[in-house]
Amino acid sequence: MCLISFAYRVHPDFPLIVAANRDEFLNRETAPADYWDDYPEILAGRDLQAGGTWMGMTTAGRFAALTNYRDPSSELKGVPSRGELVTQFLRDTSTSELFPESAEIDIDAYNGFNLLTFDGAHMGYMSNTNRSIRRLLAPGIYGLSNHLLDTPWPKVQLAKSSLEKQVSAATPDTENMLGFLRDDRIAVDELLPSTGVPLEIERALSASFIRFPGYGTRSSTVIIYGMDGSVTFTERTFDVSGASVATRKFVVDLKDQISL
């Protein structure tokens, strides 16, 4: 993922609402969201090159999502894919507080990342860019891109404010959330972060919905957990031109699985 906004225990009827975009190289093979053949409890898209995923949930209510931390100067080659961290959490049974030690994962073996985890009771956030950045989250509206949680990049602020409007409604509207994820406006130069990439790329990456030669937003996903135990998972995929290709919707029944 490259942009995630989420409301955690803010809406009285929907304890977790997630709206996110996945940005990736356009030639990287990807499978759309579905239940996995090898792990049928996992519902997620899949990176067919490395085998992991950027975001997903399970039929038991676990959720995880990941963004890369953008710092070209520290990127190492030949290290494990960060997408396997999401898969590991979804397959694990430990709490957000105990992961990843419970799975015997060395977080320093990966390039920089941010990881969000929800175990059904608590929402966790961690980043391997600084070992002190690891905590359970309080209720609130959050935004995450390719820096730390709630870093006030323009598109992060925009996504949070757009999500806040949905949270104030009686029922969040999936189409409206997919709509604000489609915002392709570029931030003005004075508001751009400096992440070590050329200015032309920094500009392109400042949009919520990215279109750049060879790279761009591949999918938008909205996940809504209801207090009634029902979760809706909606994914919209895009072609290389940015046009919508398909929208897939799943409803997961968590009754008797977790207590939200």
Predicted stretch roles:
Residues M1-L260:
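N-terminal nucleophile
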